[in-house]
């Protein structure tokens, strides 16, 4: 049975970590997802690859074709890169479908198996590699690809899934050992190749800063400072009164989110007394540069950015979609003609793994709607 169009909410696309004194390591991250429907593993799979935290490759159909995500990647690397990645991603998708087929406790309905692989090269040339498995969005198994050490959460369900998958992977011990050694080496080899090509040069793109104010309410106004179009993602944005930073509890920060073109955006807001606008400024610091931005006086027309417009449209579309689904289900119940959903909503959560220190790169998550034709041809033969 084919799934038809599947709506996915895919999280963890962009990893974030608090800025520290040490330089961030270079990283290559593979995120693969396969699906099953009523115990039948579907033929499609979804893969997203991030290079130094930026979207790099994406493969979302049965006949996968890796495509560069953003002009910054397309300008540097040629067709040979995409051909090689397409071949490797297709093989990895097949392996993950075979793993999903050996999970014994699958029940009716839609289920997902997600594999995340991350390799890093640090400033001192040390390396780290890890692999993590999620079933229906829940982490159940992690492995340090360098030490071959496995870890798993304490829940009984996670341990059952972990033993199931480990037993399958250990059916041929020598093959498994060779496979994971190659996985570790290949990831680092690809990362070094990209570093050598110059595609991940530590470029800097300064932010555009815009300060807006709301209409007065009970003698107060809300002032918002937005920074957009900057890279890298770590930025300082805060409000100051007479040159002194406001306390943390008087400000509200938005998450640092991708703009969709390889850069990032964020905002900070606070409430101030009407008439004291000239005492407040927004302070921005990014990649060694800093600037201050005053609150505009008088009434200001606030124009929506492309991201805001998309966000509002997406929320409205989601609300309409939910209403339609609710109406259809009610009608089906009344007519007793429900034969299973044509549109399925799947939420794959790229969470922090529990019980391992190897996967440290996802502390803030944003959600991005994604439409895909996964599994349009039904189950795979021989996985």
Swiss-Prot record:
Phenotype for residue 165 to I = In allele MICA*029
Effect on the protein of changing residue 196 to E: In allele MICA*004, allele MICA*006, allele MICA*008, allele MICA*009, allele MICA*010, allele MICA*013, allele MICA*014, allele MICA*016, allele MICA*019, allele MICA*022, allele MICA*024, allele MICA*027, allele MICA*028, allele MICA*033, allele MICA*036, allele MICA*044, allele MICA*048, allele MICA*049, allele MICA*053, allele MICA*054 and allele MICA*056
Q: Which residues lie on this side of the membrane: Cytoplasmic?
A: 329-383
Span of domain Ig-like C1-type: 207-296
Q: What does the subunit comment say?
A: Unlike classical MHC class I molecules, does not form a heterodimer with beta-2-microglobulin. Binds as a monomer to a KLRK1/NKG2D homodimer. KLRK1 forms a complex with HCST/DAP10 in which KLRK1 binds MICA while HCST acts as an adapter molecule which enables signal transduction. Interacts with PDIA6 on the surface of tumor cells, leading to disulfide bond reduction which is required for release of MICA from tumor cells.
Misc. comment: Recognized by antibodies in the sera of some organ transplant recipients and may be a target molecule in allograft rejection.
Full protein name = MHC class I polypeptide-related sequence A
Q: Species name for this entry?
A: Homo sapiens
Q: Which gene encodes it?
A: MICA
